[in-house]
Amino acid sequence: MAEYTAGTSPLVDLINSLPDSDGTWGPPITNETTLNGVPYAPFSKSDKLGRMADWTDAKDGRDGRGRQQYNRNYRDQQVYGAGSASLFAPPAAEDEASFSVVSNVRDTGKTRFGRGAIFTRGRGQRGRGGQDTRGGGRQQFQRGGRGGQQYGGGGYSDRGGGRGGGARGRRFGWKDYDKPQRNRDASVNIRPDWKLLEEIDYNRLSKLNLDTDEGEDVDSYGFLYYYDRSYDKPPVKSAERKLAVVDRAVYNVTTSSDPIIQELAEKDEATIFATDSILSMLMCAPRSMYPWDIIIVRQGNKVFLDKRDNAALDMVTVNENAADAPLEASEGSKDVINQPGALAEEATYINHNFVNQVVLESSNQKVDMANENPFHSASEETEPPASKAYKYRRFDLSTSEETPTYLVVRTELDAVQKNPTSGEDQFVTVHALNEFDSKAQGSGGALDWRTKLVSQRGAVVATEMKNNSCKLARWTVQSILAKADVMKLGFVSRVTPKANDKHVILGCVGWKPKDFANQMNLQLSNGWGIVRTIADMCLQREEGKYVLVKDPNKNILRLYEVPANGLDDDDEGPEPEGVAEEED
C-alpha cells in the first residue's frame, strides 16, 4: 500500500486551500445575501402571495364544481419569493403565468315583444279618413269583470325567460340552457317586397344635433278645465283617493286624418307634419327598447309622419328601460298580470282615467281655446268631451336661409291652473306613473311608494327615471312641444299587488318641463336632428310610402320603402291569443 506524506497529499492540499470558517459548517456568508448582517431571500413587490398549503381541500385540489371554480381558486397561486429569479434573468416578452382573461360581456336578455293592440274592440274608433274626415281614432277603454281587465298578449308579448343577469352579470346555473331566451317580435310584419333603404344605429342617432327656436302657435282648439290642487297633497291613510272610471270622449287621430293638418298642408304652412305622440317617439328613439314603427308618407314636397291604428307607440310602457325588464309569465303561471302586455294596458288605462279625474269639471270655470274641438260632434257622441286643448305649433328646422324647412305639430294640453304668485293661467300636461309590485320580477328595484313617496320622493323619481327613461322623455318632449308651463306626474298604485283592477292615487308632483329635461339629460337639439335627418332621407327620394321600424332586438332603426298597398290590415299582425272581446 502506498504511503503519502503530509506535504504531498492531494486531500491535505485541498483542505488547506479552504477558507477559514471560524468554526461554522457550510459555505461562507457573503455580502450579496445579507442586509445589515441579516440573511434574506431576494423577492419582488410584484410577486403574488398565495397559500403555502391548504390541508382542508381534497388531495386532487378540486371541489367538484368544474373547471371554472378550479381556475378561480387556484389562479396565480405562487409561493413567497417564487419570482426571485426574475431579478437576475431577462424579462420575458409575455408573462403568461400571471395573465388571465375575465369576460366582461353582459348577459343581454332578449325579450319577445309583439303587437301594440289597444284593449278591446267594442265601441271602437270612428273610422280614419275616407267617409268621415273629422273622425278618427277615439279610443274606448273597457273594463273586465271580477277578474279585472281582460288583458291579452296584444300590447307587448314577451315569452322570454331565464334569470336575467342585469347589470351584475352571472354564471349559468342549473338547466340555464333549457330556459327560453327573450326575443321580441317586430311591431309590424316586414314583407318580402319591402325595400330596405337605410339602417341607422343608435350611436349615429346620438351624434345628430339641430338647434331650433321655441316655435310659434298657428291655431288652437278645444277647452281646458282647471286642475284640482288637492291631489298635490299626500293622502291620509284613512282617506285615500281611489282611481275612478271617468268616461270621456278622447281622440287619438293620426296626422293624415287630422282635418286641421290637411288645411294647413293645403295652405303650404310647412314641409313636415306630425302629432306630438309620433314626434316624441322619433325624438326619443335612442332611449327606446321596445319595437315600434312610424309610417312616413311623402306627397309632393311634404312629409307626413303617420301611425297605424292601435300602434305600439300608443301604449304606455312599464319599466321599459329597467335592467331586468318585466318578462312574459310562463305557461300556467299565476303572475299573468305582471307581464309586459298586461302592464302596458293597465298603465294606458290608468293614464286615460287619471287625467280626467284630476280636473274640476265646471262649465263656469274653464278656458276655451280660439276654436272648438275639431274631432267632437255633439250630434253623434253620447259622452262629453274630455278636458283637452289642441295647439298646432310650427318650428323652424332650416339649416340654411336658402331652403327654409318648417314643421307643424299638433300638441295637446290637459288642464290649466292659476299661478300662485301672479295669478295668471298656466297650461298643464298630466301623466301618471303606476306601481304594480315592488317585490315582483321586473320592478327594477323600485321603492315601496306607500312608505317612501313622502320621505324619499327624490329617490322614487330617480328610480323611475332609470326604469322608464323612454316614457318620461316622451312626456317631457310633448310638454315642451306644447309649451306647457307645468308637467304633472301622478303616482298611482294598486290597492293590492295581486289585483290590477283597483288602484289608489298616492300623490301628484309638478315640474317645469325644461327643468325635468335637464335632470334626465334630455337634449332636444338631438331630437330635432333625428327628425330632420329622417325627413331628408324621404325628401331625397321619390313620392311614396315609407316605414321606419325599430328593430325588436337591436338598437337599430330601419327605413323601408313599401308599395302603395304595402300596409294592409294583414300587417297589423296576428290577433293575440286569449284576448277576450267584450260588448257594451
Curated annotation (Swiss-Prot):
Start-end of Gly residues biased regions: 127-167
Biological processes, Gene Ontology terms: cap-dependent translational initiation; formation of cytoplasmic translation initiation complex
Keyword Cytoplasm assigned: yes
Residues covered by region (Disordered): 118-184, 563-584
Keywords linked to the UniProt accession: Cytoplasm, Initiation factor, Protein biosynthesis, RNA-binding
Entry domain remark: The RNA gate region regulates mRNA cap recognition to prevent promiscuous mRNA-binding before assembly of eif3d into the full eukaryotic translation initiation factor 3 (eIF-3) complex.
Protein name, per record: Eukaryotic translation initiation factor 3 subunit D
Protein source organism: Chaetomium globosum (strain ATCC 6205 / CBS 148.51 / DSM 1962 / NBRC 6347 / NRRL 1970)
Organism placement in taxonomy: Eukaryota, Fungi, Dikarya, Ascomycota, Pezizomycotina
